[in-house]
Every structure is written in C-alpha cells, then in structure tokens.
C-alpha cells in the first residue's frame, strides 16, 4: 500500500521532505561531534533527493501528457536548497551554490506555472493545505543564501528575498481560514515546515540587515508557527489514538 501511494504524484513529490529532514538532522549531529556519521547521512540524503528529482521529472514531466501541478512540486525541486543551508556539514560550498542556483531557477519557473494553472487545475480539498507551501521556497532560498554567502551576502538581494518570502507568507495567512474550514486533513502536515521555515528565515534576514524594528514580527511568526505545529501534532496524536482504539477495542 505504501509503495502504491508513493507512485502517486502528490506523495512522491512530498517524499522529498525525508532527505531534507535528513540533511537537517546531519547538521545537528555534526554539532554534537558525530562528524563521520553526519557527513555520511548528508551525502546519502543529497543523493536520495537528486534521485527523487530524476525519477519524478522522468515520470511526471517528460513522459506525462500534461503537467498536473501541485504546490508540493516546490518541495521536491526547491527543497534541494536544504543542501545549501546545511553544506557546512561537509564543507562543500560549491555543492551548496549549485543546489541553491538550481532551487532559484526552479522557483522562477514553477511560480508562473502555478499562476497559469490556478484555474484550469482545481486542487482537491484533501490537498488544499499544501497551499501553505507557497511561502516556503523563497524563505528557504533566503536562509540558505545567508548561510552560504555569510558576510559577503548582498544586502539588496537579502532584502528582495525577504520581501518575496513575506509576500507569500501573507498570501498563506489569507488562505489559512479556508484551509481550516475544510476540517481535519492528513495533509495538514504541509502547514508545519513552511511556517517554521519562514519564521526562521525572517529572523536570519532581519539580523543580517539590522532591521531591529521588525523583531516583533519575527516573534509573532515564530509563535504562530509553534501554535500550528502543536495543533497539527495534537490532531495526529488524537487521530492515531482513535484508530488504535478502533482496531483494538478493550
């Protein structure tokens, strides 16, 4: 069943969250002094992500009769920028920049496609929580650019990425009421990373630019992300518990 689900377009594109999370885990393991383990995990995660991009592109882009776009496409293609954010694990800035420019290019390609497809391809209700993903790409690009370039990052470009990420974040905030009115969905998990990532990127951006007058906004976005993550985790816990009780009645 799981393998059949993985063959479906929305699931296969979302599966890229696993190598992304693995690269992030590698960064934490590296901080704990587990250097060999973290580097091994990072390279395996990068190879898995590239493999998923190749399989998905071949099956759903090159061989498909038409493009069936969902927001989770950005998880797959732009999510590779996680390698840029965490390249310090393996000290490979070249790989980081290659991944970053790839993610930037795909962002510039995908967003116009999403705009064109917004009416011709209606997103099913079960996938509408993926709308939250719209704010993730430019936030991830912002955070990874600052981490990659360090003090050499161009201030105007940081500001541009910051404004773009916040613009899409505002769009997501406007869509949240429509998402929650649909009722509980398994795809609520799509609400977590984009909101956390945007709050994290905002903090990095305002720290780099010295925009201390926006600290309150950083705190507000972090608080909202915490509330959403807690709520989604609570929903999953209750749902899994209910299923367990149903299958194993006492």
What do these predicted ranges mean?
Residues 2-27, 42, 60-85, 100, ...:
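Juxtamembrane helix-loop boundaries in multi-pass membrane proteins
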Residues 27-39, 85-97, 145-157, 205-216:
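Helix-coil boundary and interhelical linker segments in multi-pass alpha-helical membrane proteins
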Residues 34-50, 94-108, 155-166, 220-225:
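Structural signature of hydrophobic alpha-helical transmembrane segments
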Residues 52-59, 85-86, 109-118, 140-147, ...:
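Alpha-helical transmembrane segments in multipass membrane proteins, preferentially the mid-helix core
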Residues 137, 166-174, 227-233:
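Predominantly late transmembrane helices and immediately cytosolic-facing juxtamembrane segments
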Residues 143-146, 150-183, 197, 204:
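Long, repeat-rich segments with strong aromatic
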Residues 202-238:
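A generic transmembrane alpha-helix motif of multi-pass inner-membrane proteins
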């Amino acid at each position: 069943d799981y393998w059949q689900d993985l063959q479906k377009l929305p699931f296969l594109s979302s599966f890229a969250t696993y190598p992304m999370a693995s690269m992030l885990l590698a960064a934490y393991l590296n901080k704990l002094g587990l250097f060999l383990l973290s580097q091994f995990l990072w390279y395996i995660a990068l190879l898995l992500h590239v493999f998923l991009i190749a399989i998905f592109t071949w099956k759903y882009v090159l061989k498909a009769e038409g493009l069936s776009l969902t927001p989770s496409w950005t998880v797959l293609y732009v999510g590779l920028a996680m390698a840029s954010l965490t390249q310090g694990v393996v000290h490979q800035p070249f790989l980081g920049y290659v991944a970053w420019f790839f993610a930037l290019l795909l962002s510039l390609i995908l967003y116009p496609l999403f705009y064109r497809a917004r009416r011709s391809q209606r997103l099913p209700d079960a996938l509408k929580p993926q709308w939250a993903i719209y704010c993730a790409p430019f936030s991830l690009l912002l955070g990874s650019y600052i981490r990659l370039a360090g003090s050499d990052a161009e201030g105007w470009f940081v500001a541009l990425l910051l404004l773009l990420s916040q613009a899409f974040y505002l769009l997501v905030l406007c869509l949240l009421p429509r998402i929650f009115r649909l009722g509980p969905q398994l795809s609520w998990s799509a609400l977590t990373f984009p909101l956390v990532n945007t709050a994290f990127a905002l903090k990095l951006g305002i720290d780099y630019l010295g925009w201390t007058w926006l600290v309150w906004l950083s705190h507000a976005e972090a608080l909202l992300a915490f509330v959403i993550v807690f709520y989604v985790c609570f929903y999953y816990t209750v749902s899994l518990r209910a299923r367990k009780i149903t299958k194993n009645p006492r």
